[in-house]
């Protein structure tokens, strides 16, 4: 069995039912597919960087689940997410190992807009897209005001790190955590 991370955006009108739905999905993974749920993190309602047309809303309720399950389970969960009207968007990411601890970067509200000590440590040690796509304060350091990604020579990162940054920024934009361009602000 492989490790996966689900990022789910629920419609803000369904906020009171989010815990119930997450529990239902977790029990389905455990009972039907003999999977293992390592973490369920409810990130509360957040303002989106742009309005998602299908939901006609600029807010969403975010949740993250880390699971260990089979491909069959992933296909079933993908269809469950796709046909659930309460879910605006979802992202399924394959992880190398289980993630069991709550990520503090997801809960932080960066008011200053500058890199924290932990973010600088991430930048110096190396990173993968799976580790940084929800850390918006870190990703903003590598995006110009026009929305373009800073080239690797100017950013001072290797080509491999640049690919990881690009992938993480793409995922953050899909989840409406970062704007695609300056018109969305």
Language-model regions: role of each:
Residues 2-3, 7-157, 163-185:
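Structured, basic alpha/beta domains of bacterial-type, RNA-associated proteins
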């Amino acid at each position: 069995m492989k490790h996966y991370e689900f990022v789910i955006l629920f419609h803000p009108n369904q906020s009171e039912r989010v815990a119930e739905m997450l529990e239902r999905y977790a029990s389905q993974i455990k009972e039907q597919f003999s999977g293992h749920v390592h973490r369920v993190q409810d990130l509360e309602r957040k303002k989106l960087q742009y309005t998602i047309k299908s939901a006609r809303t600029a807010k969403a309720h975010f949740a993250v689940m880390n699971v260990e399950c089979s491909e069959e389970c992933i296909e079933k969960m993908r269809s469950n997410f796709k046909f659930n009207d309460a879910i605006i968007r979802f992202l399924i990411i394959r992880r190398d190992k289980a993630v069991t601890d709550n990520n503090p970067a997801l809960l932080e509200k960066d008011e200053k807009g500058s890199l924290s000590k932990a973010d600088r440590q991430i930048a110096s040690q190396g990173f993968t897209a799976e580790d940084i796509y929800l850390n918006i304060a870190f990703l903003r350091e590598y995006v110009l005001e026009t929305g373009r990604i800073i080239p690797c020579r100017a950013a001072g990162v290797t080509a491999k790190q640049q690919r990881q940054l690009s992938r993480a920024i793409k995922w953050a934009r899909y989840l409406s955590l970062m704007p695609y361009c300056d018109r969305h602000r």
